[in-house]
């Protein structure tokens, strides 16, 4: 490049050119991209390399397209005046309904198994409270079935020897009277008092209980009750579970109530139903239970209307004459509303139904959805819980706790508790094979209540579940006006199943329905999501630094790509120079003086030499006199070229 052209280009580059006064559109765009706040346009100009420029062009055009698209949607939405109307008829799935008779087995069917136990129970009541003729008010069939086969004078009582009943007097601490022998005995070990379920105005001074010991009788625990009712029933239930645990399942099903016996009439959603719509579920403590709308059905029934007319209506035959007087002290049935894949814990959360009454249960559905980790410690399906599910049902907290306890029971006591399902390769506890199981069970249960087994720490709440809020109301049924004809009709309808005339204390009416179809959903959502986090970051960067996504990309390019690239190049160049110096031997020759074009001070690629640099130049050799005259400089038209480019600059002042 000629020296004059270089001076012209240098001045043109250094002097600012204002936008509207740029001579060409290209210069105007160049100025705009260099001075605009739109980061993408600026990066297109200042980026070095074709690939980077193409990437910045793509980023910028994509951002412009998104802006145009979103703005167009906003404008169209603003000027749209149409109205949309949605009409939705909601239908709710009807839950599964499990119904059990409070009395698990017909007394006439199990009386042969319980004869000795019932006889000793009656003798205990006679000795403790002077109660005579416990079964005299019952029909003759029961009296015959419950006749005593052993007396005090005959064979010694087997059940009272296994678990002796004791009478405690507060005035004599540490001693108790054995009600069978009448002798006082010293009580060693722990004494655990269980509060009574019956309200007392004044606490009795006498306590009734029983003692459980290990095999060697060295370690014992005594359980006392303030009410004799609770003590007798708890003592009776322990022996009852031991006896029934040895009965095969098929025989127990035959000893309990069939669906045709339990269900007198059935209606759902205004349509007739029968025993075929119910599924048998055998519960260890409640016998044969029957589930309506179970998961084994082909389709899950639903309802499209609320109210008692569009739910489940059944009349139940309770058959009070077949009740075990020592096992249960109330008459009626138990009902539980639950999901189709949920195990019915009828003994824990079931609702009792009275006889001679119409029980209406209105339901309201609530669905809960919780967030799993890291927001909470819930589980989706229980796969992350280190407890084996021994129930043939979906995971729940209650299933996990009972499964954990049953597993611990098998590990510690060598057998399983009768009221829960069997773990793999386990057997139910009984006296013959496991004489120590009662003491072990009570000790383990106390540790479970005190949360010492670790079950409460490993079991987690389910993340999603359904819950039905129940509202119960009662009405006398049947009324005195309709009692006569209604009972006669029901007796005639059930003549094939029931060989007696029905009375109202044998029957119970149940209505289960949705109060309305309003479903409440409780859903957890994170208070700070990733979208909200990015939005907050963008708001802060835009407010304080006028920075956007393109600005962030620009920062990444400069400080994480270019910055380290420069450092890498410098280090590489230093390494190359060091290697070159190491391989090249030092020169002993005196360097020749550089003159003319070899002198770096006269490099035409730089600016003109200053006065100081010019003084250091060697004297120029004498040049021959040219044979031609010097050129005419006015013919180069330098003035016109400078004037056209520098019209608004103060060129005269700067030079």
UniProtKB/Swiss-Prot annotation:
This chain's function reads: This is one of the three pore-forming subunits of the heterotrimeric epithelial sodium channel (ENaC), a critical regulator of sodium balance and fluid homeostasis. ENaC operates in epithelial tissues, where it mediates the electrodiffusion of sodium ions from extracellular fluid through the apical membrane of cells, with water following osmotically. It plays a key role in maintaining sodium homeostasis through electrogenic sodium reabsorption in the kidneys. Additionally, ENaC is essential for airway surface liquid homeostasis, which is crucial for proper mucus clearance.
The catalytic activity, as recorded, is: Na(+)(in) = Na(+)(out)
Point out the glycosylated residues in this chain: 215, 277, 503
A cellular component annotation (GO) from this entry: plasma membrane
Organism of this sequence: Mus musculus
> PROSITE patterns under this entry?
ASC
Region listing for Disordered, in residue ranges: 582-636
* Protein name stated in the entry: Epithelial sodium channel subunit gamma
Membrane topology of the entry:
Multi-pass membrane protein
Description of post-translational modifications: Phosphorylated on serine and threonine residues. Aldosterone and insulin increase the basal level of phosphorylation.
Residue stretches of biased makeup (Pro residues) = 618-632
Self-association state and partner proteins as the record states: Component of the heterotrimeric epithelial sodium channel (ENaC) composed of an alpha/SCNN1A, a beta/SCNN1B and a gamma/SCNN1G subunit. Interacts with WWP1 (via WW domains). Interacts with WWP2 (via WW domains); inhibits the channel. Interacts with the full-length immature form of PCSK9 (pro-PCSK9); inhibits ENaC by promoting its proteasomal degradation. Interacts with BPIFA1; the interaction is indirect via SCNN1B and inhibits the proteolytic maturation of SCNN1A and SCNN1G and the activation of ENaC.
């Amino acid at each position: 490049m000629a020296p004059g052209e270089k001076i012209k280009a240098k001045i043109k580059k250094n002097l600012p050119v204002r936008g509207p006064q740029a001579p060409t559109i290209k210069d105007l765009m160049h100025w705009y991209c260099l001075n605009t706040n739109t980061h993408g346009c600026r990066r297109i100009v200042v980026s070095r390399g074709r690939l980077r420029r193409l990437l910045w062009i793509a980023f910028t055009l994509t951002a412009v397209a998104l802006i145009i698209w979103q703005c167009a949607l906003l404008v169209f939405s603003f000027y749209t005046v149409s109205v949309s109307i949605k009409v939705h008829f909601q239908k709710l799935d009807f839950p599964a309904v499990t119904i059990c008779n409070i009395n698990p087995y017909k007394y006439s069917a199990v009386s042969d198994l319980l004869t000795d136990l019932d006889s000793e129970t009656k003798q205990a009541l006679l000795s403790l409270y002077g109660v005579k003729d416990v079964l005299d008010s019952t029909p003759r069939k029961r009296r015959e079935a419950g006749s005593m086969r052993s007396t005090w004078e005959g064979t010694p009582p087997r059940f009272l020897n296994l678990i002796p009943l004791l009478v405690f007097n507060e005035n004599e601490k540490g001693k108790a009277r054995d009600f069978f022998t009448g002798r006082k005995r010293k009580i060693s070990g722990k004494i655990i008092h269980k509060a009574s379920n019956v309200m007392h105005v004044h606490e009795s001074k006498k306590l009734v209980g029983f003692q459980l010991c290990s095999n060697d009788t060295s370690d014992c625990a005594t359980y006392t009750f303030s009410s004799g009712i609770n003590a007798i029933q708890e003592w009776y239930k322990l022996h009852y579970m031991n006896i029934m645990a040895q009965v095969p399942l098929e025989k127990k099903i035959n000893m309990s109530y069939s669906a045709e016996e339990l269900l007198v009439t059935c209606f759902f959603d205004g349509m007739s139903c029968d025993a075929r719509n119910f599924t048998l579920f055998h519960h260890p403590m409640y016998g044969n239970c029957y589930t309506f709308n179970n998961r084994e059905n082909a389709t899950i029934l639903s309802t499209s209307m609320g109210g008692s007319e569009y739910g489940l209506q059944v009349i139940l035959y309770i058959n009070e004459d077949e009740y075990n007087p020592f096992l249960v002290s109330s008459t009626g049935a138990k009902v539980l509303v639950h999901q189709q894949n949920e195990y019915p814990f009828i003994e824990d959360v079931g609702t009792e139904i009275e006889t001679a009454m119409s029980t209406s249960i209105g339901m309201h559905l609530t669905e809960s959805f919780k967030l799993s980790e890291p927001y909470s410690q819930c589980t989706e399906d229980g796969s992350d819980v280190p407890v084996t599910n021994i129930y043939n049902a979906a995971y729940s907290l209650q299933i996990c706790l009972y499964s954990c306890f049953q597993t611990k029971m098998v590990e510690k006591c060598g057998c399983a508790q009768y009221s829960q399902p069997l773990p793999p390769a386990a057997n139910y506890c009984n006296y013959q094979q496991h004489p120590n199981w009662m003491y072990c069970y009570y000790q383990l249960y106390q540790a479970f209540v005190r949360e010492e087994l670790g079950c409460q720490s490993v079991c987690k709440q389910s993340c999603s579940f359904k819950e039905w809020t129940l509202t119960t109301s009662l009405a006398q049924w049947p009324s005195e006006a309709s009692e006569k004809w209604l009972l006669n009709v029901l007796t005639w309808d059930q003549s094939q199943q029931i060989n007696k005339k029905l009375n109202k204390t044998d029957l119970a009416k149940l209505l289960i329905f949705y109060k309305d179809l309003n479903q409440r959903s409780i859903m957890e959502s994170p208070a700070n999501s990733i979208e909200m986090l990015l939005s907050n970051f963008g708001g802060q960067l835009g407010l304080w630094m006028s920075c956007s996504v393109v600005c962030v990309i620009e920062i990444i390019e400069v400080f994480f790509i270019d910055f380290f690239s420069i450092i890498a190049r410098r280090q590489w160049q230093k390494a190359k120079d060091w290697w070159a110096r190491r391989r090249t031997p030092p020169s002993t020759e005196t360097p020749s003086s550089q003159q003319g074009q070899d002198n770096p001070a006269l490099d035409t690629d730089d600016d003109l030499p200053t006065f100081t640099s010019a003084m250091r130049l060697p004297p120029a050799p004498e040049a021959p006199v040219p044979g031609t005259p010097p050129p005419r400089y006015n013919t180069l038209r330098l003035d016109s070229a400078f004037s056209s480019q520098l019209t608004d600059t103060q060129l005269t002042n700067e030079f």
